[in-house]
Amino acid sequence: MDGNPFEETMTLRSDVGALLAEMPIFSGLDATLLREIASAVEWLSLPGGAKLFSAGDPSDALYMVLSGCLGAFSDDPTRRRFLARIAAGDMVGEMGLISGRPRSADVVALRDTELARISAKAFNEVLRGQPEAMLRIARLTVDRLAQSQSPAAAARSRGACTFTVLPQSVEVDFGGFASRLVKALSELGRAELVWSVRAKTHTSQWFNRIESSNDYVVYVADPTPDRWTKLCVRQADALLLLARAESPAGNWAALRWPHDHSMAPQRSELVLLHDSTLETGAAARWLADLPELPHHHVQSPGDYSRLARVLTGRGVGLVLSGGGARGFAHIGVVKALREAGVPVDLVGGTSMGAILGAGVALRWSTDELQERIRRAFVDSRPLRDYTLPFVSLVSGRKVSTSLYEAFGDLAIEDLPIDFFCVSSNLTTGQSMVHRRGTLWRWLRSSVSVPGVLPPVLHNGEVLVDGAAMNNLPVDVMRELGRGPVIGCDVGGADRAFTARTDEIDVPLPWQLLRWMKARRQRPSIFQILWRAGMVNSNASTIAHRAQSDLILQPPLAEVDMLNWDAFDRAIQAGYEYAIRKLEELPADSPILRSAVADA
């Protein structure tokens, strides 16, 4: 055994004064006051899976994590969400203690955890008569709260630091995968790989030392449910369920083995290893019994770097808005990001932004993206298959054909880069996010401008253009908690949408010819329907811009949303604008910190 666990625990406890001095809210207090606070400390050992407190409980104490790890979870019984990781050296509960408000989240031990507890009564008694110290603590707490609420900080707090690779069978190359993942994590910080042969004889304090001396630790579990596997599960912030994509879908024996790490399933993620080519249909097969599980495709060396960023809350998400022909500017933005070495680890979009985002998720080169989109929307003129306007002005067949020719029978879950698109459900009155299913079909729903294209009818519900309710779905990307988010909004003010005459009614039949000759004085029915389908989401778009770590709004006000011939001009405008904005970013921007040389 590596040391005496009782002695090591006592060493941690004897250093509580030094630990207090390192805590931001106590730093700067004089030594006498720190000793008084230290004397009021109580000790608490919490086994993995045990709850420290629940949302709504009275805020009767603050806690310092000496070893182990806690997780904060939302208290929504219908949709439990992981909010933050509280690691050794962190503090929890001080906000409620100072504000007097009840606990705002459930806090659970993600593994065996040692805590130092200071009751509200002891805290107040020590600081009574110390107004300057109390004011300092209050100010630091407010500052800490403000910092923690920044989008980038929130994503990092939800990112994992310790991972357990759980192979589905002995046929999986779990050793090679773990080694390559550690190499990728080493690009982000100090990382270490822990095998059973190295760690089986060590105490929990040995594991704590390994984790405290590294930014990231990867444990390699056995495919069988043995003691080592149980220990790995208890140590993990995230379980990586590893499988060969081409293998028949199966279960993980270790997950059927009873253990007391009740929160583990909240942090499980499926990783599918591919050979030389991506196995289409594999994700749906594996996700049939795990429909809500996040999943990742790993094939090339770059996929390990992407996986490392996404797992640790450093993945870059790109969100592309709708905007008709203005959406071509997204191609220029993608080109600029690639030239700057900024990776796109996740992508989502609405309407035209969804189509371009799907191309990015397929890892099309910039030239291929440009050529395919030109062929689909400029050369083929898909909005010229007019029909009797019972449901829409256009039949939609040419749009459907163009989308099918571009994407075939691909499913969203098979895309190498995580992708989603958004449509508007007129039946429920809510925005719909599509993460699974046939790609071209959901893209077709996302671009179905009401009145211009027929809606997509699905399970008795009517789906139309996502821009009607959420034209810039940064909120959807932010909810994933994977890292910084870049939003590109091309659906803003439209100077081309103007009228140069004053009138109320359409002219009488014998005046129509002269009226049509002057059509440039008034918007067309296409323009009216297109614009009307977007303005409803203006308020949400403004809010979602603010949620972006970087918001890009290329100058496209002079580009008509239906001017497909503005293809090259829009691309160039997006490219030049994005280059300027990226050059203006501060060196410590979370987006630039994620930049890679081989993006």
Across the structure, where does each feature detected by a protein language model lie?
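Cytosolic regulatory regions built on CNB/CRP/Popeye-like sensor folds
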Residues: M1-P167, D173-G175
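Structural alpha-helical scaffold elements that stabilize or flank donor/cofactor-binding regions
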Residues: I37, R209-I210, V220, C232, ...
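Walker A (P-loop) phosphate-binding motif
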Residues: A153-L188, E192-V197, G315-G322
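Switch II (G3) loop of P-loop NTPases
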Residues: E211-R227, V464-A467
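Conserved catalytic-core segment of NTP-binding enzymes
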Residues: Y219-Q299
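Non-catalytic peripheral regions of patatin-like phospholipases
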Residues: P265-S268, L273-E292, G302-D303, V316, ...
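Helix-rich "cap/lid" substructures immediately adjacent to catalytic or cofactor-binding pockets
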Residues: G302-V347
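Catalytic nucleophile loop
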Residues: S321, P343-L362
